Amino acid sequence: TAVDPDAVLELLSDEYARRVIDALSDRPASAPTLRNALSASRATIYRRLNELEAAGLVETAVAVDPDGHHRKRYHLVVDELHLRLGDNGIEVAPGE
């Protein structure tokens, strides 16, 4: 999975993004579930999920709930990141 180093570093400095990552590290979740668990606004949760997905840290899958509704569930793509300082600046790569 390719990650965007600048986006990852910016997201890791954001409290809500870190809280979303922490919640998703336990198990995949829908945006409404994250919103309730983190006591954040709908806009905040969706913004962070979109940013995390664009950065290559989160992906979505559609799941069917027991009541028949289709719901997007978000899950972490990586469980470990490596930072390296080199001649080309800061590099961020998924762990192996």
Name each region found by the language model:
Residues 1-18:
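Short alpha-helical segments that sit at the start of domains
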Residues 15-17, 26-30:
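Short capping segments at the starts of secondary-structure elements
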Residues 20, 33-39, 52:
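A short acidic, leucine-rich amphipathic alpha-helix
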Residues 27, 41-46:
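Short coil turns linking two alpha-helices in DNA-binding domains
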Residues 49:
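DNA major-groove recognition helix of helix-turn-helix
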Residues 56:
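Glycine-centered, phosphate/nucleic-acid-interacting loop/turn motifs that mediate DNA/RNA or nucleotide
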Residues 60:
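Short beta-strand "wing" residues that participate in macromolecule-binding interfaces
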Residues 66-96:
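Conserved segment of winged-helix/HTH DNA-binding domains
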